[in-house]
Amino acid sequence: MLRFEHAALLRFSERLLAGGGFPGEDSRLVARLLVKADLRGYPGHGVTRIPSYIAWIEDGTINIREKPKIEREGKISAVVDGSHYIGQVVACEGMALAIRKAKEHGAGIVVLRRAGHTGRLADYMEMAAEAGMIGMGSVSVGSGSTTSYGGMERVTGTNPMAFGVPARNGRQIILDFATAAMSMGEIQKRVAREEAIPEGVMLDARGNPTTDFKTFRGPPRGVFLPFGSYKGSGVALVTEILGGILSGNGLGKNWWDKGGHGVNGVFLQAFAVEEFQALDSFYDKVDELISFVKSRKPAPGYQEIFLPGEMARRREAQQLEQGVEIDEATWANLLRLASELDIREVPKPA
């Protein structure tokens, strides 16, 4: 593994994206979110994505010529056509709109269709939490990979769901999880680091359990299992309804053979705590809950009980000090891309 100074990696990522066709402000936004994913320990959503994103611009999967537009709007709701634009930009604008509506009317619900790959839902939940809102979100991923409980053929994508809860002192509770037994990003991280993939995550094309990602990839291709058996399977269908059907994006399966890896249907919601009680009173109770959870005795083999989002913030603080960790394969791909784009200012490992 290599480590890079945060600011240097961020500048390099911006240059790569801009050189690959991303508009200036958007290249900065996407670079910030990708590097943030690496900082927080989610390299599958980090700078490893840059070559794919640029390839998607080249093949038309990402459309940078047409901006997102609001198709339908009410006091607390909006439907946004993402126009296949850069997913992080579409989602940031969508959550910002939901927050504005929540400030004015108590709640905001924005659905996005035809959005590009949106990255980590947690980023948009943090936007809501930092605004003193409770955030909710889900995505219908346009690339089929996950089966239903009892099945062996793909039904949905890894379709994430996420929640954000505001709290004092930067201790927001941020929960972001794939409805597959393991996210594609986590699996890619393990493959890059030659780490084992546990049992109960994948089936091969014949429906047999496998821990070999090469067997999963095929051909013929296998499937991911849902998390928590029938529970995760049910949650995945809800994400498909909210992100796919409600948004007008359509079922994920309709995009499988149309470059679906770059098409997301997204559901975003923010609602104002102050519609229910004073914000300080809410914060007091959340503080009490956090303190109570942290005071519980850890089970054997555990040193501490963590809240959703807490470990990610600790990793971020550590890597800001020690350098951002990037695996050698990802770095080689970025260097190759920099050479193709004639970008000569390249950061050195810390």
Where are these regions (language model features)?
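N-terminal glycine-rich anion-binding loops that anchor highly charged ligand groups
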Residues: L2-E5, F22-T48, I62-E73, G260-V263, ...
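Catalytic-core signal marking the mid-to-C-terminal active-site face
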Residues: R3-F12, G19, L246, L251-A350
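Active-site cofactor/substrate anionic-group-binding motifs, chiefly glycine-
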Residues: G46-I99
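Residues forming anionic-ligand binding surfaces in small-molecule and nucleic-acid pockets
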Residues: I70-D81, C92-G108, L203-R221
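A generic, well-ordered mixed alpha/beta core segment in the N-terminal half of proteins
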Residues: V79-R168
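Phosphate/diphosphate-binding glycine-rich loops and adjacent basic-rich segments that engage nucleotide
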Residues: S145-T215
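Small-residue-enriched flexible segments
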Residues: S183-G248, G259-H261
